[in-house]
């Protein structure tokens, strides 16, 4: 997969930093409409120290956060939203279908389904290969810093 936005370019768009920046690169982007990002899940992730020490599994809430970050990139790349913040305002219909473990490549896709002014909603999926790990609907608001 081609890299459209590198890790350093992502950091220019969203404010998240280690250990909470959960996307490594963007591979597809249609500003304001859809975005796909990649997270290479390493055994060195700080959350694996406690979740779970004997059986490392990426917490579902962090998969959802990674999806929200991909959605934020899609919306904040729009010229009128540059320099603003994307706030995660809700989650609906969330389902976790399979575990994400060290060594996995997590493909995170978000497609906006409704955007009205600074508020919107999108459908999101996280996959490891062809296997669905998580699906949900995420809501957001774009605000001034």
Curated annotation (Swiss-Prot):
Its EC number is 4.2.1.59. Belongs to the thioester dehydratase family. FabZ subfamily. The active site is at residue 51. It catalyses: a (3R)-hydroxyacyl-[ACP] = a (2E)-enoyl-[ACP] + H2O. This is 3-hydroxyacyl-[acyl-carrier-protein] dehydratase FabZ. SUPFAM superfamilies: Thioesterase/thiol ester dehydrase-isomerase (SSF54637). One of its GO terms (molecular function) is (3R)-hydroxyacyl-[acyl-carrier-protein] dehydratase activity. CDD domains: FabZ (cd01288). Its main location: cytoplasm. NCBIfam families: fabZ, PRK00006.1. It is found in: Cytoplasm. The keyword Metal-binding does not apply. GO terms for biological process: fatty acid biosynthetic process; lipid A biosynthetic process. HAMAP family: FabZ. GO terms for cellular component: cytoplasm; membrane. Involved in unsaturated fatty acids biosynthesis. Catalyzes the dehydration of short chain beta-hydroxyacyl-ACPs and long chain saturated and unsaturated beta-hydroxyacyl-ACPs. Transmembrane segments: none annotated. Keywords: Cytoplasm, Lipid A biosynthesis, Lipid biosynthesis, Lipid metabolism, Lyase.
């Amino acid at each position: 997969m081609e890299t459209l936005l590198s890790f350093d370019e992502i950091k220019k768009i969203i404010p998240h930093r280690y250990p909470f920046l959960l996307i490594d690169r963007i591979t597809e982007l249609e500003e304001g409409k859809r975005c796909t990002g990649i997270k290479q899940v390493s055994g060195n992730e700080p959350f694996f120290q406690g979740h779970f020490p004997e059986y490392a599994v990426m917490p579902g809430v962090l998969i959802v956060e990674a999806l929200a970050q991909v959605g934020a990139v899609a919306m904040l790349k729009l010229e009128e939203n540059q320099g603003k913040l994307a706030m995660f305002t809700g989650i609906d219909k969330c389902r976790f279908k399979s575990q994400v473990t060290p060594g996995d490549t997590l493909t995170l896709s978000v497609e906006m389904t409704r955007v009205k002014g600074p508020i919107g909603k999108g459908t999101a999926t996280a996959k490891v290969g062809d296997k669905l790990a998580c699906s949900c609907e995420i809501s957001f608001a774009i605000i001034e810093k």
